[in-house]
Regions:
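Intrinsically disordered, low-complexity repeat tracts enriched in Gly/Pro/Ser/Thr and acidic residues
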Residues: 1-251
Length: 251
């Protein structure tokens, strides 16, 4: 497209000040229309350098914002459309796809604290599949909706704890598997980040609990496997404590 400008008999004119007197253009024209390569300057210090079609920023160019931020990439109808790099004055950046001035498609975003996200965007928000990393080594890989963990995903903490399962609004919600680095494992339901519902809990020494949880604690009836005696025992738990095993004295 840029090469086509060579065949359009474009001409250079003196700097043109728009009637509003808020911006000045200097560059190429086609007849009486801004067309080709040029520079547009605003009174607040913002500046666009690149290509124009019918008076609008198009194809490719670089916009310098008055606050020091820059966008360099593809344009259509005065808006970022296509691939481009937005660099904040503080060093944060987004490198990826755009649609009508919003992040849309695939991209990578980094923040000043070292956090980063690489994945899908829709209308300026993290939406779809992506990977979010924190500077302490924590990482989430999975589905996003409206910038939040939502759907299936895997979260790994810096201390190597790991959760694989369902999420809703940044919280573990639904079925999942939580593993600890010492070998413990919870396999069951979550509600708003807390264990709730039926689950199976494994200890590294061979103990197993199958039963119900409420508000993050064992609560209700359950079955407990004692590896030392190689037996299963049915019992009752309240707020994380074993009240009794059926057919036995209180424990």
């Amino acid at each position: 497209m840029i090469n086509n400008f060579k065949d359009m008999n474009l001409i250079l004119k003196p700097p043109y000040e728009f009637p509003s007197k808020r911006r000045i253009y200097y560059g190429e024209w086609k007849d009486n229309e801004i067309y080709g390569r040029g520079v547009q300057q605003w009174l607040d210090g913002s500046r666009y350098e690149g290509y124009f079609i019918e008076g609008k920023a198009s194809i490719r160019g670089k916009l310098y914002h008055s606050n020091g931020d820059t966008y360099e990439g593809e344009w259509q109808n005065n808006k970022a459309n296509g691939h481009g790099l937005y660099l904040h004055v503080g060093g944060e950046y987004y490198d990826g796809d755009w649609k009508d001035d919003k992040q849309n498609g695939r991209g990578k975003e980094t923040w000043i604290d070292g956090s980063s996200y690489e994945g899908d965007y829709v209308s300026g928000k993290r939406y779809g599949y992506g990977i979010f990393k924190w500077p302490d080594g924590s990482e989430y890989e999975g589905n996003f909706c409206d910038n939040m963990f939502n759907g299936k995903g895997k979260y790994t903490w810096s201390d190597k704890r790991e959760y694989i399962g369902e999420w809703e609004m940044n919280q573990m919600n639904g079925y999942g598997i939580f593993k600890w680095p010492d070998g413990r494992k919870y396999q069951g339901d979550y509600k708003r980040d807390k264990k709730e519902g039926f689950c199976v809990f494994y200890w590294p020494d061979g103990r197993i609990f199958k039963g119900h949880w409420f508000n993050g604690k064992q609560h209700g009836e359950g079955d407990f496997y004692d590896p030392k005696k190689n037996i299963w025992k049915k019992g009752l738990w309240e707020n994380g404590k074993n009240i009794k095993f059926f057919g036995q004295n209180e424990s």
